[in-house]
Swiss-Prot record:
It comes from Kluyveromyces lactis (strain ATCC 8585 / CBS 2359 / DSM 70799 / NBRC 1267 / NRRL Y-1140 / WM37) (Yeast). Keywords: Cytoplasm, Nucleus, Protein transport, Transport. Belongs to the cut8/STS1 family. InterPro entries: Cut8/Sts1_fam, Cut8/Sts1_sf. This is Tethering factor for nuclear proteasome STS1. Pfam families: Cut8. GO terms for biological process: nuclear protein quality control by the ubiquitin-proteasome system; proteasome localization; protein transport. Involved in ubiquitin-mediated protein degradation. Regulatory factor in the ubiquitin/proteasome pathway that controls the turnover of proteasome substrates. Targets proteasomes to the nucleus and facilitates the degradation of nuclear proteins. One of its GO terms (cellular component) is cytoplasm.
Length: 333
């Protein structure tokens, strides 16, 4: 019987070869000394035959250790030819740049600098629509900014120019009297509505009590009325509806400014300049087809009241020290 030595080889000899080897060893120990050489030769023959069978894989009980995978070395890569190039390409690692600079969005102040007026207005209005809670804060900020008459006039000129640019080019757009047809109104309606709404918004923000100067209010009112008279008319009466409504509102604004000026004590000594503003209104009323008749009638009422108060002062000298409530502005100042 064989004894274990504490480890196993990479292969184990077959059972038949092992038994024959043991039998040969027993025979060599029991024979006489004169047969020792023959027994050694026989045992040696059995060992060679068993090694030959194991070498050619005839044993069915071959046991081997699992082979461990290893990486290709530089020598293996150089010896394998085309295969080595593929392995080298797969196993190659790309360099990793850890300290590289990434792009970043443009800061908000720089973005605002690059925006034009239309884009900035669109972004601001969309922001207010999406977040109505900020409307009050934005409104407070805007109200703290004061705008002058020149800025108002510039914007109105641009919008009036846009109205004329929207007139379609066709010889059939105008009639013999210069009125535009329905097709032209359909093309121009958006710009006309924008102009009319802008006129009313600017006027309401430039009259008392929003404005402290009645003189500036009347001057801008005169300019706005002149712009409105330049708006084209249309053949169909319904297409002139928006323009007529705007004239009605402007007529009421004229009356409000006139009443405010007449009750302002700081202008009580300039009643003689009332004729200047009356002349301006007569000119505007003639161009607008008598749509400003109401403020003209109000001026006539104020003139009559001023004349009556003047007669009272002449008949009662003591009343001259009492302040008068009638006053107006000088358009030329």
């Amino acid at each position: 019987m064989s004894q274990s030595v504490g480890f196993e080889w990479g292969f184990r000899p077959s059972v038949s070869s092992g038994e024959n080897l043991n039998m040969g060893q027993e025979q060599t120990s029991s024979t006489e000394s004169n047969d020792i050489s023959n027994d050694h030769e026989r045992a040696h023959g059995h060992i060679q035959s068993s090694q030959h069978r194991l070498t050619h894989g005839t044993s069915s009980r071959r046991i081997s250790k699992p082979r461990i995978k290893r990486r290709y070395t530089e020598e293996d890569v150089s010896m394998n030819g085309p295969v080595s190039q593929v392995v080298q390409r797969v196993s190659k690692k790309k360099p990793v740049y850890r300290n590289y600079i990434q792009g970043q969005p443009l800061p908000f102040p720089r973005s605002v600098e690059l925006m034009d007026k239309q884009l900035l207005q669109s972004v601001l209005l969309s922001l207010v629509r999406e977040h109505p809670e900020i409307q009050h804060s934005l409104f407070s900020k805007v109200q703290s900014i004061s705008f002058n008459k020149e800025q108002y006039v510039k914007v109105l000129k641009e919008k009036l120019t846009q109205v004329y640019e929207d007139i379609p080019y066709s010889k059939y757009n105008q009639s013999s009297d210069g009125l535009l047809n329905d097709y032209a109104f359909g093309r121009m309606k958006a710009s006309i509505m924008e102009f009319l709404n802008c006129v009313i918004d600017f006027l309401l923000s430039s009259i008392p009590p929003q404005s402290d100067s009645v003189l500036q209010s009347l001057k801008f009112l005169n300019c706005s009325t002149d712009f409105l008279n330049q708006l084209p008319d249309f053949e169909t009466a319904s297409n002139n509806y928006y323009k007529n409504m705007c004239f009605e509102q402007i007529s009421e604004i004229w009356c409000s400014c006139i009443q405010f000026a007449s009750t302002d004590l700081s202008f009580m000594s300039v009643v003689s300049n009332l004729e200047d503003w009356e002349s301006v209104l007569h000119t505007l009323n003639g161009r607008s087809n008598n749509r400003l008749q109401k403020p003209l009638e109000l001026i006539g009422t104020i003139k009559n009241s001023a004349a009556m108060m003047s007669q009272d002062r002449n008949g009662h000298p003591l009343s001259q020290t009492q302040p008068s409530t009638v006053g107006f502005l000088n358009i030329s100042s």
